[in-house]
Amino acid sequence: YVFGNMNEDDLAVGVRDSVEEDENKRNKADFVLWFTKSKFDSQELKWESPWGVGYPGWHIECSCISYKHCGEYLDIHCGGIDNAFPHHTNEIAQSEAYLGHKWCNYWFHVHHLNTNSGKMSKSKGEFLTVSLLESKGYDPVIYRFFCLLSHYRKSLVFSYENLDNAKGAYEKLVAKIAQLLKAEQGEVDKAAYDKLREGFTAAMDNDINTSLAITALYDVLKADTTPATKLALIADFDKVLSLSLIEKAKAVNEKPADTNDELPAEILELAEQRKQARCLLYTSDAADEAR
């Protein structure tokens, strides 16, 4: 049991109401590679095999797909925290028994996305899709930015208010980069570049701490160095973050001038105060910078 330091003697059988103890098991830790006796009355997908007509177990499907498309070795295997046991544990057991060597170097388990009422669950009809966000007018990159502001080992609470706060922070970030693009560039300062890049690299090396990585991005914007240096770093960081920062900033600069100068100064001030008041979201290390 490679995850969670579990002890086989402590495992309980059939604890959930939806799970019955399988009388075909010789050992409580057994799991099925190939079903010849279906759990389901209406099982339709079946194939001939050396072991009889049947279908693959849940775990073997994933091992076979990985082996076919990625080969014998995986560097990083991702999944939700609820896949760590038993699914990924069983994947390791069967894959390494077949391959005869270590299969994956790193396992990356992301914690749950929650609502205020608890964990999002497809079975409860409570789940989020990118197409749903797009239908509500959100660019998918906003959701990505929202997720990156929190560490993957922490459960993340989703609400549209929180997403709007992330949207405001992202737009402010892009606006600052847009200003850099319009500034006199100067030369890339190699020493400053290397020093600032160290902060980002250290954050990602620290258990993929994207929250600290975003902080390192804001540090670049505040740094006393040339626009050329800052833009080179932002482009470099975005190879990892995939936030389309330069692309979005260029799009901002290509837009026609807005008509804000036609609005009364009092209205503009109130709008800015309201915008600032809404940015109360983040508890991560990137929070103060995002606000």
List where the protein language model places each region.
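Alpha-helical recognition segments enriched in aromatics with Gly/Pro capping
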Residues: 1-179
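Intrinsically disordered, low-complexity regions of eukaryotic proteins
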Residues: 32, 287-290
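Structural preference for alpha-helix termini/caps and helix-kink/transition segments
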Residues: 119-121, 127-284, 291
